[in-house]
Amino acid sequence: LVPWNFPLQLALQSIAPALAAGCTVIAKPASWTPLSLLAWAKAIDEAETGLPSGVLQVITGSGGLIGDALAGHPGVDGIVLTGGVPTGKAVMAKASERLTPVTLELGGKGAHLVFPDADLRTAAKAVCFGIFMNAGQMCWAGSRLIVHEDVHDDLVEAIVAEIGKWPVGPGLAEGVRM
């Protein structure tokens, strides 16, 4: 069960090892972003990789309906979900009825720690990248900033200067950073 923000990357990090281990995989992308995973699965099928028909399946549609069906199905031996806490709770509850193993990554946020001896220009670049990459829509976004009081004001100034250099606009436009 794959989220919308990095649908292909997050799907493949679970699909590849499962296929390598000889497992059949049913992938369910977020209903907002199914195309990249569908295109990848089609490319795998057309490339004649030797993967037997039906070993890799992509199911699209309502997350609640399909996720619930997969989590409770007796033929499902394991579930990997990257998503929100409410979805994780629902999948875990349904899967627990059959004792199906579940691996959850539920959208935690990372922290940046900045100490007094830090290079503040480098720290500002890292902070901006960590929180604003992909518009901050990442489970590991550095959305918490813990800064020693001795460098707080200087770091804020450096962050403002750094983010001021970032072109803002439509995501597919040339040179846009945010």
PLM regions: where:
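Rossmann-like NAD(P) dinucleotide-binding subdomain of oxidoreductase/dehydrogenase enzymes
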Residues: 1-122
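ALDH superfamily catalytic-core signature
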Residues: 78, 86-178
